[in-house]
Design a protein with these regions (language model features):
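Membrane-interface extramembranous regions
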Residues: 1-145
């Protein structure tokens, strides 16, 4: 697959997985967590941020800051998931992959989002390096080495 097709594919796939994670959090908010102090609003905030960033990712080629924000929202969701199963978050704890199947689906979409964003960033970096003109040493210096 050439780079001209890869970048739009990565952009669309990243936006899709980010939006899917947001949808799962919105669904959990409506079904279960809206009455949980602090946690409920955080689920709603995560869902809103995911939807907004997913939409912005689809509008042209986003700058690095936007991709970093998408990664940050995703990392925040994963950190909250891990913390809620270990030390707890604001007194809230859960165990295992409950609620099922949303916990597992959320883990998969968020891990997929991070993977896609990482591949996208590596591809953009390689493309920028390839576009630079190589620095050549003057002929005099090459002859003496």
């Amino acid at each position: 697959m050439n780079i001209q097709r890869l970048l739009p594919t990565l952009r669309s796939a990243s936006a899709a997985t980010l939006a899917a994670g947001g949808y799962i959090h919105a669904q959990l908010y409506v079904d279960e967590y809206r009455f949980v102090h602090v946690i409920g609003p955080l689920f709603l905030l995560q869902a809103s941020a995911s939807f907004a960033l997913a939409a912005l990712l689809l509008v042209g080629t986003p700058p690095l800051l936007l991709r970093a924000a998408a990664a940050g929202v995703t990392l925040g969701a994963l950190a909250g998931f891990i913390a809620s199963r270990t030390v707890g978050v604001f007194g809230f704890t859960e165990h295992g992959l409950q609620p099922a199947p949303q916990a597992l689906l959320s883990l998969l979409t968020e891990t997929g989002t991070l993977l896609l964003l990482s591949i996208w960033q590596m591809t953009v970096t390689r493309q920028q390096r390839a576009a630079r003109t190589p620095v050549r040493t003057p002929l005099r210096e090459r002859a003496t080495h």
